[in-house]
């Protein structure tokens, strides 16, 4: 199995991936709080982890992927009160919205999507264990985690308790043993959902939810935990304290991976700053593949600045890849035979495949991996031009292997799935026959030197997304997918 290195936020260095269970990769990614439609800052981690999961499967790992929904939260409660509907109505509405846009972006469904609201018993049990072990204490129906009890607190974020207290922006609660102690259970308040517990009616705190759900489905030690870099502190720091305090297992997570922010004019995009763009709105102007490619065009740990110009660039890049796919599908139909050029193309394809895998195996560097993909696309297009400029034959065995390699690349990145289908819809035969009639009429115009009419046919087809390519072997049409 190919060696993979990952950048571990905990150790602040790259490490060779060594799974808890050989041959398996267990990953937990913090999901959305469903109180609004997802914006592209929300989308980045899920597209990133979709690619990580795809590549881990390609390498040969059995992947278990868990992603939660934080469907009990202050923001959901505030939205429900503002609209005069129940909190679960709000949560369900925006969970549906999440799935709609992620499906459009080609994000494959996680194996498990636990919700906080259906795991209250697990959360209560974990809190009780923390109390029993001396890590937590109850105050007037609230339960707090005592950060001073956990010796590793601050290791993920690289902060000491003194640093945290000095820079804290939290309400001072004189009842707590330490200002940094955080809520595991919140006593019920009027107008909020609540559940029964040993400490009275209430609801979970934010951090305990992920600890309880990750351990339930992945065990007390698992491989990957991911999320945005804004979650390092306090959320993931607190998760570690809870999970390891409860189980005694250190570390509870072997590798912590965090993606960078999406920025607008170098400022972090977020709902709280009101400078965000909803995925559903962007998809009204750009294809899902264009947005997905944009999100993967920079290494996941680096910031990514959003602009219409970047999305236009993504569209143009995908058109180049789509052309290479169409050319490969055309070459598959050419006359079979031996050809040294095809073998040379295959040798280059294998070299690009190795480069692609090297990049993905080095902390999932999609920016570098896609450069290999474009390198191969260029070689495919050059070869296609050589074949169509003469009456040539094609080594079909070589082309089939080049196709496998190129499709592997686009499958891992998760783009242009429909392009590989070619024109295979329900009316494909009729569509092809109609296009051949149009092309024959255009060719007759060219032969009779009616250039303006021939150009008019070409231009009108272009307006509806159909491109005509002329070669010595005749005209070929293709429909733009992006």
Residue ranges of predicted features:
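Alpha-helical recognition segments enriched in aromatics with Gly/Pro capping
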Residues: 1-35, 46, 50, 64, ...
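Short, glycine/charge-rich beta-strand/loop segments that flank catalytic centers
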Residues: 69-74, 95-98, 108-123, 141-150
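N-terminal, positively charged nucleic-acid-binding surface of large information/translation enzymes
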Residues: 11-14, 20-106, 473-477
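Structural preference for alpha-helix termini/caps and helix-kink/transition segments
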Residues: 268, 276-482
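Short phosphate-binding/catalytic loops that engage adenosine nucleotides
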Residues: 61, 135, 466
